[in-house]
């Protein structure tokens, strides 16, 4: 078994969406375990505070801009790991879905993740292979949630892409996996799920009896990047307290 607090020494990781939520928690956890973190986010103040906390390298970028996304990945250089955490949602019903909503969600959740993965993989192959990609998806890609039309499609699409990446990149020594969290209690989610009428029916569907916190997801991500998971690729790991099991 690896020593997590030594394994990531002298290793570098790109984390998109690192300013808030799961991305920020993962950046903190990877830095705590010795990794050099290159944090990407669109909000400068988030990057400034994260840099003050963990001493990371920061890149301010709007990943919905294809050209900017590729430029940011090239600026980051060849790294050992990529964690695609950047995500967004626009709540629209099937009948009210707009093209703008579709583009906003797909642009960040799917297209940007694929661009970042492609640039990361190209750099790894050019340097001799190896490394690992971790995509953050959602249980929304497995179950139908009201007003999550585009979000569900984007996350299911990223899971499909994860499997294709694992198949195509495996012989270069690059592992590709994903985690699929349930409701995760970021500051934004805590406010959204504060109403018991909304929260309680969802909570009861979790055998473990609670929603996830960002640390639950971050530590699972670290495990999948570690050498303890060296035989794991093409896997979608639910972080859901048993939600998908019932």
Segment roles from a protein language model:
Residues 172-175, 210-239, 243-245:
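C-terminal substrate-recognition "lid" of short-chain dehydrogenase/reductases
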Residues 138:
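Residue(s) in the substrate-gating loop at a strand-loop-helix junction
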């Amino acid at each position: 078994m690896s020593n997590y607090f030594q394994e990531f020494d002298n290793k570098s990781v790109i984390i998109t969406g690192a300013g808030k939520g799961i991305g920020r928690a993962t950046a903190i956890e990877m830095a705590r375990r010795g990794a050099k973190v290159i944090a990407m986010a669109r909000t400068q103040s988030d990057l400034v505070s994260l840099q003050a906390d963990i001493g990371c390298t920061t890149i301010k970028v709007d990943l919905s801009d294809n050209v900017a996304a590729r430029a940011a990945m090239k600026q980051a250089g060849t790294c050992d790991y990529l964690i695609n955490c950047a995500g967004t949602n626009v709540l629209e019903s099937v009948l009210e879905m707009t093209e703008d909503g579709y583009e906003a969600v797909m642009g960040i959740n799917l297209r940007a993740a694929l661009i970042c993965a492609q640039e990361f993989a190209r750099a790894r192959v050019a340097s001799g292979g190896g490394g690992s990609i971790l995509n953050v998806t959602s249980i929304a890609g497995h179950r139908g949630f009201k007003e999550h039309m585009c979000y569900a499609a984007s996350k299911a699409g990223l899971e499909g892409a994860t499997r294709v990446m694992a198949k195509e990149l495996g012989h270069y020594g690059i592992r590709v996996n994903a985690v699929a969290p349930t409701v995760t209690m970021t500051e934004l989610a805590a406010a959204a799920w504060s109403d018991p009428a909304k929260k309680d029916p969802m909570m009861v569907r979790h055998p473990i009896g609670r929603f996830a916190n960002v640390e639950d997801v971050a530590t699972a991500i670290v495990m999948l990047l570690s050498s303890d998971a060296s035989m794991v690729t093409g896997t979608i790991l639910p972080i859901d307290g048993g939600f998908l099991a019932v």
